[in-house]
Amino acid sequence: STLDRSSAASDVYKRQYAYSAVYYPHGVSTNLDGSSIVIPSSSIALRTFAYNDQVAFPWFAPAGFQRGVVTNASSVGYVDSASGEFKAVSLNEGQRDSLYSNKINPIANFPARGVNVFGQKTLNANTSALDRVNVARLVVYIRERLDDIVKPFLFEPNDAAVRADAKAIVDRFLANLVTQRGLFDFVTVCDTSNNTAERIDRNELHIDIAIQPVKSIEFIYIPIRVQNTLGQVG
């Protein structure tokens, strides 16, 4: 039916953009011959991802003054459609907030701090931790590593001993992510509760995982209370 097709299309959209992010604006960089060129915001973001992974881990937010430093653009702005010239843009706090509320990660030039990526929202349509880049990259990392970690269990006997070994190796991997500040906690299940007789007969091994990812600080509140001279501060 039309409703079914619409629902299916919506599901595809959510899956397609759950791990996507948008950045604004573009930037000016230097070409190999020394000339100035305009580079897309995606190029700036990817360079920032690479820098983040050099100094931290993929599950740290590639944004802010610590890991969001832009090293491949001297200024940010847009190309004017009428003149074809690059127009520098200095996003103020209100403009940055407006962009961020619409899931657009601002790239801004800060006085005495230079150009920095100042947001890390994804286009995830659902309300979940996957609406942040650091969590999305964490999940991608976990999926890729687990794919390698469990491969040695292919064609092994699907019995209690192998299931215990599989759970143990996954637990060690996830425990390491807790140490490396990627996860707060996790739970894994690999026993007869999720490896039923039917699944075993289909030659399948199931390892169910639930994770609590570490989230980044994006808002800081410091309330200050002023006391009179005779008042007690407490």
Where are these regions (language model features)?
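Structured, hydrophobic secondary-structure cores that serve as assembly/anchoring elements
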Residues: 1, 7-234
